[in-house]
Amino acid sequence: EISLGLVGSEMCIRDRDIYKERKLLGEKLVSPILKAIDYDVEHTVFSFIPNTAEVAFYGMLEGFDNYLNELKVRKIEELGHNPSHEELEKILSWRIRSEKVAIKDIKLRTFIAEGNSRNDLAAHVYDITYGSLVPHVDNLVIIDDSIVRGTTLKQSIISILDRLNPKKIVIVSSSPQVRYPDYYGIDMASMDQFIAFKAAIELLKERDMKDVIARAYHKSKNQTGLPKEQMVNYVKEIYAPFTNEEIAAKMVELLTPKGTRAKVEIVYQTLDGLHEACPSHTGDWYFSGDYPTPGGVKLVNQAFIDYIEKIYQF
């Protein structure tokens, strides 16, 4: 007989662990965000996409509070032995600016709809809080839990945030780039659903590297008759020529609507950051392509073949 009290305690412990992990995912993004805003914390407003990214947002804020405290200490030390009250007050008054910029105006998520209806829905999910930043002066950093398709970014979020006239919009993903289908619970088997995959394919085309696509396809096709235990995930070769930053930059081009005034950048969590934040959870196959079973490799192999034969008509 299982004690309900014991089960409840274990669930509470697990919930607490998940909360800590999500906060740490946000905290670990401080360094790349600083680079994206050119270290101009004073003229940056931090926010989050409701509602799943809220915990990572708090972790990100804690990370920036720690950064700002270290900066305050250095600035005070530079004042020497006899700083004035005004000098100290000015430094100690520095604060990380956070606002709830994006508001979910209907309780719907875009993944519940399909096709065109998904795009129609995406345009109506979010609204913004005017007056939350100084137009043309402040950067806007806004964190989300993940970016898979990019549908809501392209159809809704970037355009809506741009109405606030920020100098720069930095979209932050608390998880790494989703590059591969899951196959173990989340139904997203089509390769062309992933904005990371689309970006990598576009980069290969632009840089006259279509031979990489052809080689990956033929390697995948040639192993279809093998036992699944002998199969290799050759889709990794599509991403291999590029850095995470190059792929993210191409995503920005693909997702930024025409007429957007603000400069846009996307910052992603790294795989190392993910593992450091969640050391007890080694499953990272939809980010890394390292499937835990041969069946996953077989399925991604077929998904890639299906995509190529549909698009390129091999």
Protein language model annotation of sequence segments:
Residues 3, 7-314:
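PRPP-associated nucleotide enzymes
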